[in-house]
Amino acid sequence: MNHFVYLMDKYGNPYSFSLKPKYYKTLVLSGGAMRGVYLLGALNGLKIKINKISTFIGISSGSIICFLLSIGYTPYEIFISLLKYDNLLTINLDKLYSGDTRNEGGLFSSENIFKHLETQMRLKEISRSITFKEHFEKTGKILIVMAFNITKCKEDIFTYETTPDMEILNSLKLSARIPIIFGPIKYNNNFYIDGGVWNNFPIDIAIKYHNKKNKKKSDWIIAVTTLFSTYKQNIHQWYKFSNINIVMVNDTPDLNPSLVSSDLEKLTMFNKGEEKASLIKKQNIRRNSI
């Protein structure tokens, strides 16, 4: 019996999806700004048991979603909160006309994004200053966030083990810094930009962490991105790992989402993600019933 559905990434490399795992222990989400709504739809369509996930790994907008999932939100609840909160992106008009991109960086402000995030934290009785260590002690979940350190030209990884006293909000601000839109941000005498610039789909981090912790063979990883998001061609080397399921949601060709996407665009993305995930599951079930 063939337990797998075989699919293709944007480079034509095959990857697979299996119905074997009853639940997942590790979740990986790519970056992609508002394209993260596709990922929320996919997670909802897969009917993943979020409460069974012990490790959340995210880049850029994926890191924000991972954090919200780790404190108890469902993919659908996060999606609904985005429909209720439209003004995520604020234009820095003074900087737009002057060309000054210092301080907060870029031509736009991320202030409203993090105001919205803080609101969601308060609703779950999570302190805005919660650190990685406090988060782990409170939730029992491991959160791994990545950002690109342009001062040292390397990827920095933030976890309760490497940066226990770092406030999670600070790590998310470092990770979700899309170049030009937001610009670099300074932290501990280093400047950071969006983690997706270096590694937008960190499957490798999940597998290395899995091996480092001597995880069981029954501990599966689920990794979700959009088909045409930014990921390197050599990512296919990680597809062969036996305990990973990958979902790449087909981006809608006529939709170019931004941080000011309309509710209709958000709904379209969520539905596309949900449809893709549901289709993969149906194909797998159909194949195994023949």
Swiss-Prot record:
- Domain PNPLA, by residue range, is 27-207
Instruction: Mark the transmembrane ranges.
Output: 26-46, 53-73
Q: Name one GO molecular function term.
A: hydrolase activity
| Sequence motif: DGA/G, positions | 194-196
Q: Describe its membrane topology.
A: Multi-pass membrane protein
Cell compartment(s), UniProt: Membrane
Biological process (GO) annotations held by this record are: lipid catabolic process
User: Which cysteines are disulphide-bonded?
Assistant: none
- Domain of life where this protein originates: Viruses
Residue interval(s) of motif GXSXG: 58-62
What is the enzyme's main class? hydrolase
**Known function:** Probable lipid hydrolase.
Recorded protein name is Probable lipid hydrolase 463L
Q: What is the organism of origin for this protein?
A: Invertebrate iridescent virus 6 (IIV-6)
Taxonomy-wise, where does this protein's organism fall, top ranks first? Viruses, Varidnaviria, Bamfordvirae, Nucleocytoviricota, Megaviricetes
